[in-house]
Amino acid sequence: MIATEEQARAFVAERCDAAGMERIEALVAALRSENERQNLVSKGSLGEVWQRHIADSAQLLDHVSRETGLWLDLGSGAGFPGLVVAAMQPEKPVLLVESRRKRVEWLTDMVKALKLENCDVAGMRLELLEAREAGVISARAFAPLEKLLRLSARFSTDTTTWVLPKGRSAAQELQGVSRKWQKLFHVEQSVTSEEAAILVGRGRAKT
Ligand SMILES: C[S@@+](CC[C@H](N)C(=O)[O-])C[C@H]1O[C@@H](n2cnc3c(N)ncnc32)[C@H](O)[C@@H]1O
């Protein structure tokens, strides 16, 4: 279990090259500065930004094979987890979906500043996004599982990998959805918190 900022930084460094680490350092610096202007993340979490946001996002890579297609991140907010993934693996195509204007501006600015040619921002509600096939679907603190699956099912295929950090509610939320959806997922322990878990799944979420 990651317990310190140093451990979190080392965890991330093991999963990307030096250029990736430089991009992540730049992202952290920009986040600290932008958070003075808009509430991208809670002030309290900035003191543990590597544990709470960066490593928390980076750990999803351990559940995803390297060759998957488009990584679709729903409700990216400040960029977690999608922007972190895009910065660590610039060969991975990533689409960040976010509806709030100021957050869309922040994400767009960061994609430009970090020179992430692999990463696009869809500044709109997910409901309005044109259907496309996603190799990976991620979403942290986006919506309750039932709603999340209903909104994103149309982007999934038989080979889609789902990585859904769900905090302490993971197992309970999974029990609350229909059996056809339960079958797709299992619960993985988060490495950033004893209490948190990630719903990892594979396949098409039929509606
Ligand atoms: C609680 S925040 C989480 C942000 C980020 N994923 C994180 O974990 O730090 C949820 C984000 O989802 C966005 N959002 C909520 N509903 C959405 C929708 N239907 N389409 C696109 N974005 C949405 C919100 O604007 C907000 O930025």
From Swiss-Prot:
Catalytic activity: guanosine(527) in 16S rRNA + S-adenosyl-L-methionine = N(7)-methylguanosine(527) in 16S rRNA + S-adenosyl-L-homocysteine
Source species taxonomy: Bacteria, Pseudomonadati, Pseudomonadota, Alphaproteobacteria, Sphingomonadales
TM regions (residue ranges): none
EC number: 2.1.1.170
Residues that coordinate or bind S-adenosyl-L-methionine: 75, 80, 126-127, 140
Family: Belongs to the methyltransferase superfamily. RNA methyltransferase RsmG family.
Subcellular location: Cytoplasm
Protein name: Ribosomal RNA small subunit methyltransferase G
Alphabetic keyword roster: Cytoplasm, Methyltransferase, rRNA processing, S-adenosyl-L-methionine, Transferase
Organism expressing this protein natively: Erythrobacter litoralis (strain HTCC2594)
Gene3D superfamilies in UniProt: Vaccinia Virus protein VP39 (3.40.50.150)
Gene symbol of the encoding locus: rsmG
